[in-house]
Amino acid sequence: MQSQRNKVVVHYSDGTLLKGYTHDFVPDKESFHLNTALEPGTGTIHEVEISDLKAVFFVKTIEGNSSYTEKRTFEEIDAKALHGIKIKVEFKDGEIMRGISLGYGKAKRGFFIVPIDPRSNNERIYVVASSTTKVAVGAEAEK
């Protein structure tokens, strides 16, 4: 059985970005492999250490849509369509991200969030907990 190729954009803690495909990302593992090829069978394979990352963005398209302005606050969307815990993540680099999480826990090494904007190019984001300065949940995430 062939494993699924996930389109990802890897954000390193130092600001470096890598785009490509992975078939072996597992949150509990220390690393995974990223193929930077846009075509199967080409490109470079990188071993990516989770501890070096800010986040892994699982995306709909590698290219994205630079002309689209993503909704970033809970007020901009239909809150009734959200299923999960509201979450606000503040990263060490100053970026603030809001979304929904089903598995956030303070003691975890990382957690997934789903963007609040259904039209976002991001399907889900794995946030590396050590890259954050603050995480707020529930009503606190709306501030």
Which sequence ranges carry the predicted segments?
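Conserved RNA-binding domains used in RNP assembly and mRNA/RNA metabolism
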Residues: 1-143
